[in-house]
Amino acid sequence: MALRIRIPQSRSRHSLLFQLAVVALVCGAFATIALALTGGYYYLRYRGVVDARLQQPLFATTAKIYAAPREVRPGQHLLLAQVVRELRTAGYTDPSAATPSPLGTFASTDTSVDVHPGPQSYHSQDGALIRFSAGIVSSITDDHGQPLSSYELEPLLITGLSEDTSRTKRRLITYGEIPPNLVQAVLAIEDRRFFEHDGVNFTRLFSAALRDITTGRKAEGGSTLTMQLARGFFLTPEKRFKRKIIEIVITFQLEHRFTKQQIFEMYANEINLGQRGSFSIDGFGEAAQVYFGKDVRQLNLAECALLAGMIQRPNYFSPYRHPDRAMERRNVVLDAMVETGAVTKETAEATKLEPLHVSRESVDASDAPYFVDLVRDQLTQKLGDHDFNREGLRIYTSLDPDLQAAATAAVVQSLPIIDKQVDQRAARLHHSGPITYPQVALVALNPHTGQVLALVGGRSYGLSQLNHAVASRPTGSIFKPIVYASAFNTSLAGTLLPGYDSLFTPLTQLSDEQTTYEVNGQEYKPRNFEGEYHGEVTARFALMRSLNNATISLASLVGFDTVASLARDLGIASARATPAVAIGAYDATPLDMAGVYTAFANGGLKIDPWMVASVRTPSGDVITDYTPTSKQILDPRVAYLSTSMMEAVLQGKGTGAGVRNMGFTAPAAGKTGTEHDAWFAGYTTNLLCIVWVGNDDYTDIKIEGAHAAAPIWADFMKQAVALPQYSDTAEFTPPDGVQLEQIDSTTNLPADSTCSSDTYTAAFLNGTVPQATCSHPNADHRNFLQKIFGIGNKKPSQ
């Protein structure tokens, strides 16, 4: 019988447990070793990444682009609050601040603002006392009490110009400049144990991981401020487990290299807090200016809580787009601050009653992406390989933030109306397939300085970065004033046009009949836009109604080569001596055409448009200053005669008269343009604006300039003349050698006392006014000069 040995069951169980424990320990050891090796591998691998990153400045000293300074003048309609807001936005602080701004300081009362530029100001350190009364600047005096005729405020920052072409706005701040309430608000809502943990809050991290598992999706949560900083500086925003490990590794390295205060300072400058136009708002310093129009040191409790609350989802909690959400989130932060003991419950409840008090949202200087692109290009041309980013240069430009806002608003408001016209036309033609909607460009400048004040290069920078303001297109009928200026030049020289017995004037009769020309062996038969022909018309009427055939007829009399030569002198390099040159068949950019029209608006002196005024080091040393280039192209008398003719375009039956119906009433001159594209060029005594509307594929827009470009121009100019700096428009003043005459509308002859009251004003070179009048049309038609020299016929031209 076999011997059976029975092992006690308890002993067997203990042995099994022992074996399992050994296996567990071995596995744990291996896991620990593997984890240590993995951690060591990642630590060593990413230490190099961190080292490389930290060898560079954490925040690159990018070049900063500034707008033009606002000029304040006695008698100007301007509120004290506007000046205060602009000084704060520019970075000026109260002189009693713990750390006054190096840009400058200011102090205000109910009736005055005392401005003192600092060592880093754009201007010299000469201060000014600006006094106000009833919404008007009553006086400006310097530091010695002497009166000033004007004073320029500190230019506003547009953007930082980074090497990777990213569009961010950031104002670097130090930890000492951050209000304690802002620090406590951020800690209360984002990382309450920030000053206690070593970079990773494992309790929150595991809770977030468990939440991911139970919900089946990867959500944010569990990250400390240091982890957020690690992610922002070194990693992409993708949500993967491996990235989280790397994030933790980098977090430990940051914690060991920097103090908590340094980490918070970096976080405060790095965190994204929304979007303004095409620019990202990064850091509390910039956010304080954007949302509240003040320096970060001046933020109150409610403002601190709002900014802290926006960290989680800045666009979702935007006080502009979602004010209710923003207020609710702000109040959540205030409750969190009560929980941490940062504020009392009574203080929090009182603060909750405050409205949002954010600055007016507008498309301001920060929304000039096409302008900024051109500035970047100009800097590259001017400075070559100069590393303006590394040196953190300051680039001062020509941009007027108020006017840029008006330009953008005019485009945004007008495009839907233009698109509707396109849709209606497509419906009438039963068009099938995709519809092409037109692009747009707007250029506004000071006609006396060439300063580009506003520029819009397209309907949406986000959709297309192609800058139509510098894209060449056929100029269409806005070219025609060059033809008439060429004709006035012949009068100035005392030269008769072929077949005429009197010098050219606005009353000269032109043939508006369809005519065939031969160009390079081929027939060219131009037609008027509406297919209507008027027979004999005055030159004034031909330009006022934009008659193609009459204008080409005049160009043929002057000489196509003469017209093309003047066009090239004015800046249209492509112009050639063909009949089509007279109606704008050759290309130029909207920016080019703005330069062309300065000659008409500036007494014949053409000024090249410019955008970069000065490039300086961070300490204020000048690297280069821009000097405008100009050339006298037209005689002042010819410039005025052309302007007077273009004033008529905006009156009565002129093609641009619609701008008056749209509410623009200031004295102005202009010209519509309709070829394949729609144009409008116009100016007052202090502002010139060109608008272009057309298709990228060069197809015919099929909308007149009066219905596509003119409404944008009118909308923009109405806003512009309402601004203090452009409100002082005046009538155009004739120079010496030009006289104004009342002309009878029926006979187109000088009016006398027996004529009807239906008259208009026309400008003439001295001595060229016809001697015949409305009541004596058969009188000697020769002008004064012709009578003296015995030339010409006594009968009027037919």
Predicted regions and their residues:
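Active-site loop and adjoining helix of the penicillin-binding protein/serine DD-peptidase-beta-lactamase fold
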Residues: R170-I178, T251, E255, I311-R329, ...
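Short, low-complexity, Pro/Ser/Thr/Gly-rich segments in the mature regions of secreted, periplasmic
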Residues: H781-Q798
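Bacterial peptidoglycan biogenesis and beta-lactam-recognition machinery
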Residues: Y92-T93, I178-N181, E190-N201, T214-A219, ...
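Short amphipathic alpha-helical face segments that pack within enzyme cores
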Residues: A185, R204, L306, V332, ...
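Conserved structural-core and active-site-/substrate-pathway-adjacent residues in large, well-folded domains
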Residues: L87, V186, L229, I263, ...
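Conserved catalytic neighborhood of penicillin-recognizing serine enzymes
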Residues: R211-K239, K294-R297, E361-D367, A493-V563, ...
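A penicillin-recognizing enzyme superfamily signal
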Residues: T397-P434, Q439-N446, L455-V456, S460-H468, ...
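Juxtamembrane regions of bacterial inner-membrane/periplasmic proteins
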Residues: A2-K420, R428-G433, V452-L453, G458, ...
